[in-house]
């Protein structure tokens, strides 16, 4: 039905989260229409530039073009406070509350043994190195309120149990199964203010 290149574009667009065949088809037709071609080329240029030039901050692993991101490079941030999150979108969600002044560590995932995702795959050794090498007074674990998020939180907490670092987990006004990037600001503010110690069940 579609020309080879049109089909290739539709299939490529389906790699985006939440984009199925119908949505991808609609997007492809929009970009190929004469009125959308300039935007399509601009999108292509922006995507190629970002993929070539954007990497991960060497401290927190958030996306940046520089060795250090703006947060890690900001001397006004509290370097003794470290918040562990699953994704860069979680950093954005917390930053939008404007109440957190510390720094971050982005795991880019959570523990999921059935999927072959262990501590190495989500950078936990790098996190533990950072905790050893920096003067961190409190570690806030802000993983999602899912079984995997909880397992990840307990794994991290158990590995710093012998240190003097205070370890807390954001309180759950965050609903079970919920993800930080979809929460409203009020819920996030409450959760950050109501942190609780991580304890074994």
UniProtKB/Swiss-Prot annotation:
Highest taxon listed in the record's lineage: Bacteria
A molecular function (GO) term: zinc ion binding
SUPFAM superfamilies: Recombination protein RecR
Pfam families to which the protein is assigned, alphabetical: RecR_C (PF21175), RecR_HhH (PF21176), RecR_ZnF (PF02132), Toprim_4 (PF13662)
UniProt GO BP: double-strand break repair; recombinational repair
Stretches annotated zinc finger (C4-type): 57-72
Protein keywords: DNA damage, DNA recombination, DNA repair, Metal-binding, Zinc, Zinc-finger
Domain spans labelled Toprim: 80-175
CDD domains assigned to the protein according to its UniProt record, in alphabetical order: TOPRIM_recR
Known role: May play a role in DNA repair. It seems to be involved in an RecBC-independent recombinational process of DNA repair. It may act with RecF and RecO.
NCBIfam families: recR (TIGR00615)
UniProt cross-references to PANTHER family, sorted A to Z: RECOMBINATION PROTEIN RECR (PTHR30446:SF0)
Homology family: Belongs to the RecR family.
Protein name: Recombination protein RecR
């Amino acid at each position: 039905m579609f020309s080879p290149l049109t089909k290739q574009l539709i299939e490529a667009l389906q790699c985006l989260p939440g984009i199925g065949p119908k949505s991808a088809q609609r997007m492809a037709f929009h970009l190929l229409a004469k009125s959308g071609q300039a935007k399509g080329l601009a999108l292509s240029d922006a995507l190629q530039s970002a993929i070539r030039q954007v990497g991960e901050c060497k401290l927190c692993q958030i996306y940046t073009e520089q060795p250090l991101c703006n947060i890690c490079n900001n001397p006004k941030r509290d370097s003794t406070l470290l918040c562990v999150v699953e994704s860069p979108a979680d950093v954005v969600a917390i930053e939008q509350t404007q109440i957190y002044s510390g720094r971050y560590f982005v795991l880019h995932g959570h523990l999921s043994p059935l999927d072959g995702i262990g501590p190495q795959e989500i950078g936990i050794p790098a996190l533990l190195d950072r905790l050893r090498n920096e003067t961190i007074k409190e570690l806030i674990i802000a993983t999602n309120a899912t079984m995997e998020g909880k397992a990840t939180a307990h794994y991290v907490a158990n590995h710093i149990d012998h240190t003097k670092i205070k370890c807390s987990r954001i309180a759950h006004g965050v609903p079970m199964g919920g993800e930080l990037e979809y929460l409203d600001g009020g819920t996030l503010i409450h959760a950050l203010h109501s942190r609780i110690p991580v304890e074994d069940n």
